[in-house]
Amino acid sequence: MRAGQPKITGAKITGAIIAGGQSSRMQAGGVSGDKFLQPLGSAPVIAHVIARLQPQVDTLFINSKGDLSRFAAFGLPAVKDIAMNHGGPLVGLLTCLAHASPCRLLLTSAADTPFLPCDLASNLIRKQAETGARIILACSNERVHPIVGLWHTDLVPDLEKWLQHAEKASIFWFAKHIGFEVVNIPLAHAPRLAESYDPFFNINLPDDLLKAREINEALQA
């Protein structure tokens, strides 16, 4: 693992790693357990996410709707989803926004994206300062990544209302409802890889895990 760059000064920011999902596609492919706890080099996948994000934020915690004891080894607070009739990733986002509310800004990421840019926070914060937008989402290869974003914590009432009435229970549609800006992040390179890779590459399938191990080995070279 390689640590991220220090956060930029002048902005208090909380980070949240959202460890949602059932890992069903990974398990259907014959790999048991949570995808974010699969070994990647010398550490689990989520440990790489922590190493990338922790230097970029003031505080960092993990969010999950499952058994929080799974995260005891990582030395971070773990926060369980708020109990709601509604389900899905928006509940995780609401939980994170509410937990982070003493801070003005929340940076979110999924737990299965081990190659996050080391300057992610600074790029998103800079865009927020330029535009004043309450939501800034990461984008790469012409694809928006709604789970990777910078959120103003005053969005809690908006999201609570959205969850009461929304027909489309996705983070993207909530962000579209509020309005968001994007930061385009270029593809990344490693000396021993023939092709560039997406820094927001996430692990869902056994083949994804194999590819992640290839990228990780190249980065450690």
From Swiss-Prot:
Annotated Gene3D superfamilies: Spore Coat Polysaccharide Biosynthesis Protein SpsA, Chain A (3.90.550.10)
Residues holding Mg(2+): 112
GO process terms (BP): bis(molybdopterin guanine dinucleotide)molybdenum biosynthetic process
Reactions that this protein is recorded to catalyse: Mo-molybdopterin + GTP + H(+) = Mo-molybdopterin guanine dinucleotide + diphosphate
Any one of the GO CC terms: cytoplasm
Gene Ontology MF term list: GTP binding; metal ion binding; molybdenum cofactor guanylyltransferase activity
Subcellular location: Cytoplasm
The keyword Transferase appears for this protein: yes
Cofactor requirements of the protein: Mg(2+)
CDD domains assigned: MobA (cd02503)
Residues bound to GTP: 18-20, 35, 63, 81, 112
Keyword terms of this UniProt record: Cytoplasm, GTP-binding, Magnesium, Metal-binding, Molybdenum cofactor biosynthesis, Nucleotide-binding, Transferase
Class of this enzyme: transferase
EC number per UniProt: 2.7.7.77
Keyword Metal-binding part of the UniProt annotation: yes
Subunit structure: Monomer.
PANTHER family recorded: MOLYBDENUM COFACTOR GUANYLYLTRANSFERASE
Record-linked HAMAP family: MobA
Family: Belongs to the MobA family.
Domain text: The N-terminal domain determines nucleotide recognition and specific binding, while the C-terminal domain determines the specific binding to the target protein.
Function: Transfers a GMP moiety from GTP to Mo-molybdopterin (Mo-MPT) cofactor (Moco or molybdenum cofactor) to form Mo-molybdopterin guanine dinucleotide (Mo-MGD) cofactor.
Protein name per the record: Molybdenum cofactor guanylyltransferase
Native species: Brucella abortus (strain 2308)
Recorded name of the encoding gene: mobA
